[in-house]
Amino acid sequence: MKAKQIAIIGASYLQLPLIEKAKEMGYTTHVFAWAADDVGEKEADYFYPISIVEKDKILEKCREIGICGICSIASDLASITVNYVANALSLPGNSMETALKSTNKHEMRKAFEAAGDPSPKSILVTDPDAADCLDVVFPVIVKPTDRSGSRGIFKIERKEDLKSAILSAMESGFEHKALVEEYVDGKEYSVEFISYHGEHHFLAMTLKYTTGAPNFIETGHLEPAPVDEGTLYSVINVVRHALDTLGITDGASHSEIKISEDGTIKIIEIGGRMGGDCIGSDLVRLSTGYDYVRMVIQVACGIEPDFEKVCPPHPAGCRFIFSQADIDELSKIQKEDPDKIIKVVDYHPEMIGHITDSSNRAGCYIFRV
């Protein structure tokens, strides 16, 4: 019997669980990314040194291979290419309009506003000099329209700092545009769903910890989030409606929200892909028993996702390494309570002192709660 061929976009440590799971499921893996000696290059059955943004080159190769599905996890940029190729080859995926709305925060905000989804008010800025003319109430959040991973995000408390923040955000983005949006107070959460033929299945809600202002780099996650049933019910309904607004029909989604003290829910953003930072690849499976990565592969290949639990659910967390104190804490746990640590991921202690956003943290460890 001929092996099933699947394309995977990206080769970093974030994609490693996807590559490994696809091989475990009997697929031959064809991985596309620029050559950077990443772990996915070595794990793939076939690796192609093509940048993930070179959609037409990837499409040409995938057509030649005869893939039965294409997917990626934890990458907004990769999700554009995934849907481009899927649409061209009549494979399962979301429309290119949906890909735009779920990766460009301005288009997302417009869609949410038109559909009545609760989301911060925002203003699109294409010229930093416009800062002097903006009628906003401080504090505000400034961010690029098309980046993720806490890149180029600032909380600005006064007008004097607004222009420089806009300039920095624009320089961080691919299309060099920025959003200035109202600051939403409250606890941060993310919500994982898997969608199949337009039906959205809730998987998990995660409590998120960050460095706070000004850059909000994520420092850790806890799953399941400690919220009451009423709050969870409201969150699920809000997110389901927003997924329909964006047109997400197939595959994973990662929704970031804030909940204020009075229970008001605001959608910060939604990505048409699995949550990164080990949320989708590890925490969902540990805390719910569901194999989220397997579901992503199944949906990408036109197969209904399997909700059979693969392990007993147990609360789990992820903590990121920023400092020597974090390394010392990890060493202490490994010595005093080694069974608590499930694994250490992407450990690069040489990055301590050089961390600017989520992409260059010094690693993380996943633990039992």
Set out the residue ranges of the language-model regions.
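ATP-binding N-terminal substructure of ATP-dependent carboxylate-amine bond-forming enzymes
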Residues: 1-97, 305, 350, 358-360, ...
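Active-site nucleotide/adenylate-binding loops and adjacent lid/helix of ATP-dependent enzymes
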Residues: 103-179, 185, 197, 225-237, ...
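Peripheral (often C-terminal) accessory segments that flank ATP-dependent C-N-forming ligase machineries
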Residues: 130-131, 297-369
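Glycine-rich phosphate/pyrophosphate-binding beta-alpha loops
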Residues: 150, 271-287, 347-350
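Short, well-ordered beta-strand elements within core beta-sheets of diverse protein domains
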Residues: 154, 182, 285, 363-369
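Phosphate-binding core of ATP-grasp and ATP-grasp-like enzymes
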Residues: 169-177, 182-225, 233-266, 271-280, ...
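C-terminal, non-catalytic macromolecule-binding modules
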Residues: 287-300
